[in-house]
Amino acid sequence: MNTLDFDKKPEDTRVVVAMSGGVDSSVVAGILKRQGYDVLGITLQLYDHGAAVHRAGSCCAGQDIDDARRVCETIGIPHYVLDYEKRFRETVINPFAESYVAGETPIPCVSCNQTVKFADLLATAKELGADALATGHYIRSRPNPSADHPGRRALYRPADADRDQSYFLFATTQEQIDYLRFPLGGMPKAETRALAEEMGLVVAKKADSQDICFVPQGKYSDVIAKLKPNAALAGEIVHLDGRVLGRHEGILHYTIGQRRGIGVATGDPLYVVFLDARSRRVIVGPKEALETHRVYLRDVNWLGDEPLLEAASGEGFACYAKVRSTRPPEPAVLRADKDGIYVDLTIGEAGVAPGQACALYSAPGDDARVYGGGFIERSEREPMAEASLKALLASPVAA
């Protein structure tokens, strides 16, 4: 039986497995080998940031490459290491730093999937004659054929809601989805760990990757300051009502919705409401000023069955949306008009930051289809806060 939905025997089906050196991709390789597929393991060397290479929970660095090699030896498949460090720096690390300089809060994992993994590695898999590229992501794909595209597939949330990675995969294109396979989509993480133990894999008890892989000890500001010194320039901390409350040592130390460590006190709780990168101002205000009901999107990747503009015009497209990875999908309407493509959130969200993602779904449950999404370009707050912010941004900045 071909579990990957190909009309041929497993032994006649070549699969490249993207192996990060973690337990998930290792188990994928082991499962496919057991099922009789022609499996090749490929690990990408993406960066070498000193301490990050040996940091527990990093990925695609020195120790992880060695772990992937040992796993491949155990299960009996070839293993290759490709040096993508330059490509990773150009398409992931540099844009990450530039996004922070612009006052955004980026998601480099999405950029990595978009470029290095699902573009470059996928192309390499095809050059090797593989029928599919398999990964250890927790997401499901199923056949969704049409008359013009009999091999078309669709994405769905995974069985293990706690491991749902669909938010980070919203930008996966239809062509990539048709070629990719996600064997862990229907499996809880506990079962993955148990399989790793059963297979005798060296990574069975290895900790899951945490934070951003190329950031040593999770200190984003150190990496950004090194790559983009302008992000560390001092500026004003300003209240929405126009009062200058103090000064900061660089907008790279702040993100929308932040409360702790702002550096000023007024007696009332204050939150970061906006990062004015042009004037190097950190704008703060009360919690209610964070309430967001509309987000405008850029770089939209639409995975619905009808064309985007056709679906989103007029009354809009009723769906569910996530504006942060840890939140469940909430009711929303996708719209398109002369102002662009945007999502109206039925239930307001606090602390929505530009640069983050808005992923779209068919339903709120674990079996929901993924309709794609886009990066948040800007958001609209409740009317009074929005008016105050616009007035403040239009005012001159003291020299």
Curated annotation (Swiss-Prot):
The record marks H137, Q356 as: Interaction with tRNA. It is an enzyme of class 2 (transferase). Its EC number is 2.8.1.13. Residues 163-165 are annotated as: Interaction with tRNA. It catalyses: S-sulfanyl-L-cysteinyl-[protein] + uridine(34) in tRNA + AH2 + ATP = 2-thiouridine(34) in tRNA + L-cysteinyl-[protein] + A + AMP + diphosphate + H(+). Keywords: ATP-binding, Cytoplasm, Disulfide bond, Nucleotide-binding, RNA-binding, Transferase, tRNA processing, tRNA-binding. GO terms for cellular component: cytoplasm. The active site is at C112 (nucleophile), C213 (cysteine persulfide intermediate). Transmembrane segments: none annotated. It is found in: Cytoplasm. One of its GO terms (molecular function) is tRNA-uridine 2-sulfurtransferase activity. Disulfide bonds join C112-C213. Its main location: cytoplasm. GO terms for biological process: tRNA wobble position uridine thiolation. ATP binds at A18, M19, S20, G21, G22, V23, D24, S25, L44, G136. SUPFAM superfamilies: Adenine nucleotide alpha hydrolases-like (SSF52402). Pfam families: tRNA_Me_trans (PF03054), tRNA_Me_trans_C (PF20258), tRNA_Me_trans_M (PF20259). Coiled coil: none annotated. PANTHER family: MITOCHONDRIAL TRNA-SPECIFIC 2-THIOURIDYLASE 1, TRNA 5-METHYLAMINOMETHYL-2-THIOURIDYLATE -METHYLTRANSFERASE. NCBIfam families: PRK00143.1, trmU. HAMAP family: tRNA_thiouridyl_MnmA. Belongs to the MnmA/TRMU family. Catalyzes the 2-thiolation of uridine at the wobble position (U34) of tRNA, leading to the formation of s(2)U34. This is tRNA-specific 2-thiouridylase MnmA. The gene is mnmA.
